[in-house]
Amino acid sequence: MKQIALILTLLLAAAGASAQEVFIGADFDTWFDNREHSDCNIDDSHTFFSMRLAPKAGVIWSEKNQLVVAVDLLQDFGDKEHKFLSKVDPQIYYQFNSKTAQAVAGIFPRSLLLARYDPFFLGSAYSFYNNRIQGLAAHYKSQTGSFIEFALDWEGMRSYQTREKFR
């Protein structure tokens, strides 16, 4: 947490020194899914009820470039295992924006993707609880609204216990 605060302080100091645009903001989301059912052998009964807050700050330069630092704060309601928050994750990413193209690299929210995938591929609970992409994404959007998008999510670093995993 101290490292994130230091990075944010340096980012804001550098932005002020070079007279670039500094911004702050936050994203907020909640999730409720009551999966209480009886006599089902496929899945256990349970209820998902959570909230997520992601305060962010960053620098914009040349109108098309952004460097963003955020903290993703997740709280599962009724969670007795954690004293304060259920999960805290960093988001640090570079974003390029133009009228027809966007590119993002780093650790960034899944909400920056244009495509909304069917729950068959990415379940709604999976998308909420795994809302960050660690990798890169790019898309091109035509004037008619059609688009092509590429995203690479590096979910697992190779170690003695795990294999590399990309999605």
PLM regions: where:
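Residues that define the transmembrane beta-barrel architecture of outer-membrane proteins
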Residues: 43-53, 84-90, 130-134, 164-166
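Surface-exposed strand-loop-strand hairpins of Gram-negative outer-membrane beta-barrel proteins
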Residues: 31-52, 77-80
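Residues on the lipid-exposed face of transmembrane beta-strands in outer-membrane beta-barrel proteins
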Residues: 53-59, 92-96, 136-140
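Outer-membrane beta-barrel channels and translocator barrels
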Residues: 60-64, 97-101, 143-145
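Transmembrane beta-strand segments of Gram-negative outer membrane beta-barrel proteins
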Residues: 19-36, 67, 103
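Bacterial Sec-dependent N-terminal signal peptides
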Residues: 1-25, 138
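Surface-exposed coil loops of outer-membrane beta-barrel proteins
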Residues: 36-37, 102-167
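Surface-exposed loop and membrane-interface regions of Gram-negative outer-membrane beta-barrel proteins
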Residues: 67-96, 116-123
